[in-house]
Amino acid sequence: MNSLFASTARGLEELLKTELEGLGATDCQVVQGGVHFQGDTRLLYQSLMWSRLASRIMLPLGECRVYSDLDLYLGVQAIPWTEMFNPGATFAVHFSGLNDEIRNSQYGALKVKDAIVDSFTRKNLPRPNVDRESPDLRINVWLNKETAHISLDLSGEGLHLRGYRDGTGMAPIKENLAAAIVMRSGWVPGTPLLDPMCGSGTLLIEAAMLATDRAPGLHRGHWGFGGWAQHDDAIWKEVKAEAQTRARQGLAAYGSRFYGSDVDERVIERARRNARRAGIGELIDFAVKDVAQLNNPLPKGPYGTVISNPPYGERLESEPALIALHSLLGRIMKSQFGGWNLSVFSASPELLSCLQLRADKQFKAKNGPLDCIQKNYHLAESEGGKPAMLAEDFANRLRKNLKKFEKWARQEGIECYRLYDADLPEYNVAIDRYGDWVVVQEYAPPKTVDAHKARQRLFDIIAATIAVLEIAPNKLVLKTRERQKGKNQYQKMAEKGDFIEVQEYNARLWVNLTDYLDTGLFLDHRIARRMLGQMSKGKDFLNLFSYTGSASVHAGLGGARSTTTVDMSRTYLEWAERNLRLNGLTGRAHRLMQADVLGWLRESTEQFDLIFIDPPTFSNSKRMEDAFDVQRDHIRLMTDLKRLLRKGGTIMFSNNKRGFRMDHDGLAALGLKAQEISQKTLSQDFARNRQIHNCWLITAA
């Protein structure tokens, strides 16, 4: 009998144990990452040929304590390597694990290689050569703390490499994991199996091989026992011949079909090639089809199983499309596949909830570094029609707001407005419309809120938003932000450079919904910008802390004699220039200046009739000369502004400081007075958030 070890993906150990026992293995003991078992030579070869779940089959050779590199060398050399190698056999060493003495896996592999080679030279035998690419023998050494476990890897390459796949689509799963997903899906061989996002066909091919009794190792051309002196070629040939016979008989006897579809024509063609190489191509119907086009291939029966490993994104920007995809899949399952079973494997439990189905069973497994879950559902025969909306109370509020604001915005001549602003506390997001695009901004939840529940609620919000607004998922942009404390934090998010043109009254403006936390247009200042346009005719206009210059555009369109736009950011000044140019506002009358605004104010000697200033609540930028606090420093600011203000001129002063208190006495000492116009500058879409900004008109007393 041989003591053997089969490794597998985390989470599949018990399933592998059952499989090995079915092959005849005895004394099976589950450990993390695999199963120890006993078996004779025939069982050894059968496990290599027939295990659909094992990653590798290893023959343990010994172990040694490692307190130094010499201990490792001597421990390896104690194994009778000369009795193990066929003459001329090549080998490679795979070393994993570190300890205080062996701190580099390459160094560990080198010491093992030296010990093996020296075993031959000491006996005056030809030394074996190393072949890292395709060795005849593969030695596996795992160093766990102070113990090195030394094994002969009889698999050679990983057993997931069946020999039928020449390439994959994006984010593939290994074949042994695919086999486990099939085994856990509840699918019964002989009944239909459908994969609506099949990619390169791995799930369906593994299922078809299982159903037709085709051994997973039948198409492999290289093994790890070719140079093993104890290899019994006669028994191996018997095992292989039996597998070939069973595959022929299984294929001839199988009567059901498999169905696979994917939106990518090239991936489907690859799936067809893979299936043909696996010997089961005639059983699988592959089609180029989007999930939205999915239909039941057997509407009159029999019932079958839908199995899928849909995409699950790790980037925030991909989530709206994935949420919509899962919601769509759930709706199609309910409407067209009543009586069937569904099994979905995913790294995102939150996305699975978008199916709006109740799971009967669930399993956990690792897909590489990802913690994944597989959920099985039974689709009731009576399921059908329109499913209930996720987050129904949120959806109802959004629907109500849409009805109210859509007509109003059309009448106002604006394309950008707020549709929802945390109206319901449990749905803590802001939703803004920019033409036919929508931006959902999630306010970062408090640390006391369960992260999983918060993410789940966000997914519900996105699914409901897409449904209520009837928008394409790629027209929804998702952002997460702290509650805004001012406009000093223009955080860079991406480098897409995608700008869209929007209309605000008579102004055309560029917005960018993806590259920054903000979009280039502060919607709450819409009415203030219109007022500036109405006040600007024939005047010299100054825009300080100008951001993307939208106020300058309104002033220019309102007939300003000149506009001067000042900001410290080159990025935003270039954006402002694009906005001005889009509206035909070019030439010497429309200046843009990159400068520290506070420093520029102190040094400038120019005069202006109308000044708009919207400073940050607080800033200590390295490029500014000193820290700025709008509450503390606004009178100092007004001192500089007054010097630039012509007789009869007006300053429009706005900021986002909640609870801001104007120092009227300080203003009076400067010969100025302030009229608060905050409520006049708030439009309907910001009526619920009356403290989003405060705004003042400041003139000579």
Curated annotation (Swiss-Prot):
- S-adenosyl-L-methionine is among the record's keywords: yes
Q: Which PROSITE patterns match?
A: THUMP (PS51165), UPF0020 (PS01261)
CDD domains in the record:
AdoMet_MTases, THUMP_AdoMetMT
Q: Which reaction does it catalyse?
A: guanosine(2445) in 23S rRNA + S-adenosyl-L-methionine = N(2)-methylguanosine(2445) in 23S rRNA + S-adenosyl-L-homocysteine + H(+); guanosine(2069) in 23S rRNA + S-adenosyl-L-methionine = N(2)-methylguanosine(2069) in 23S rRNA + S-adenosyl-L-homocysteine + H(+)
Task: Look at the named UniProt entry and state the broad enzyme category this protein falls under.
Answer: transferase
Main location as per UniProt: cytoplasm
Domain spans labelled THUMP: 43-154
What keywords is this UniProt entry annotated with? Answer: Cytoplasm, Methyltransferase, RNA-binding, rRNA processing, S-adenosyl-L-methionine, Transferase
The protein's matches in Pfam families, at most eight in alphabetical order, are given as: Methyltrans_SAM (PF10672), RlmL_1st (PF22020), THUMP (PF02926), UPF0020 (PF01170)
Gene3D superfamilies in alphabetical order: 3.30.2130.30, RNA methyltransferase domain (HRMD) like, Vaccinia Virus protein VP39
Q: Where's it found, cell-wise? A: Cytoplasm
What the entry lists under InterPro entries is as follows: 23SrRNA_methyltr_KL, DNA_methylase_N6_adenine_CS, RlmKL-like_Mtase, RlmKL-like_Mtase_CS, RlmL_1st, SAM-dep_methyl-trfase, SAM-dependent_MTases_sf, THUMP_dom
Q: Name one GO cellular component term.
A: cytoplasm
Q: What EC number(s) has UniProt assigned to this enzyme? A: 2.1.1.173, 2.1.1.264
| Keyword Transferase carried by entry | yes
Molecular function via GO = 23S rRNA (guanine(2445)-N(2))-methyltransferase activity; RNA binding; rRNA (guanine-N7-)-methyltransferase activity
Purpose of the protein: Specifically methylates the guanine in position 2445 (m2G2445) and the guanine in position 2069 (m7G2069) of 23S rRNA.
- Stated family: Belongs to the methyltransferase superfamily. RlmKL family.
Put simply, this protein is called Ribosomal RNA large subunit methyltransferase K/L
Question: Highest lineage ranks of the organism?
Answer: Bacteria, Pseudomonadati, Pseudomonadota, Gammaproteobacteria, Enterobacterales
Tell me the gene name: rlmL
